[in-house]
From Swiss-Prot:
GO terms for molecular function: acyltransferase activity. It comes from Mannheimia haemolytica (Pasteurella haemolytica). It catalyses: a fatty acyl-[ACP] + L-lysyl-[protein] = N(6)-(fatty acyl)-L-lysyl-[protein] + holo-[ACP] + H(+). One of its GO terms (biological process) is killing of cells of another organism. The active site is at residues 22, 91. Signal peptide: none annotated. It is an enzyme of class 2 (transferase). This is Leukotoxin-activating lysine-acyltransferase LktC serotype A11. It comes from the Bacteria. InterPro entries: RTX_toxin-activating_protC_bac. Its main location: cytoplasm. Belongs to the RTX toxin acyltransferase family.
């Protein structure tokens, strides 16, 4: 670890502290979510005039780790962050109104990707919603086909994991 690593960690921590949602989360969760992103270079940090304004991180999961993540968002190990090709946004922090710019930059960097996230509202931290996003160059028909495939695979895996009984 060097000075730039700690500067990066400090910038991201500062953004977390300024986010209404993230500032309530523990240091342990910050470490679990941020350190693997830095070590695997799976993040984007936007800086404006020397000040961090937005950050996101992602993990590329296999189906097994995707199910594990949905069951417990703090469960991923460092190695699991790069276990497959099913991209999940782990953190999205833009406390100063730069969310749209971050979205645009991610679409430019990954124009052909399908990305999912579990979104939480500050007043409902125990209930998350899975959201889907597509890269800027991915046409709607192809994106929908991929969305549907991912959804079907995930639903089947979750059904098998929880042993749901069909009535």
């Amino acid at each position: 670890m060097n000075q730039s690593y700690f500067n990066l960690l400090g910038n991201i921590t500062w953004l977390w502290m300024n986010s209404p949602l993230h500032k309530e989360w523990s240091c342990e969760l910050l470490a679990r979510n941020v350190i693997p992103a830095i070590e695997n270079e799976q993040y984007m940090l936007l800086i404006d005039d020397g000040i961090p304004v937005a950050y996101c991180s992602w993990a590329d999961l296999n189906l097994e780790n995707e199910v594990k993540y949905i069951k417990d968002i703090s469960s991923l190990t460092l190695e699991e962050w790069q276990s497959g090709d099913r991209r999940w946004i782990i953190d999205w922090v833009a406390p100063f109104g730069h969310s749209q710019l971050l979205y645009k930059k991610m679409c430019q960097k990954y124009p052909d990707m399908i990305v999912r996230s579990i979104r939480f509202q500050p007043n409902q931290k125990s209930v998350g919603k899975i959201s889907y996003f597509k890269g800027g160059k991915l046409d709607k028909k192809t994106a929908k086909k991929r969305f549907d495939t991912y959804q079907e695979e995930l639903a089947t895996a979750l059904k098998n994991e929880f042993n749901f009984i069909k009535k």
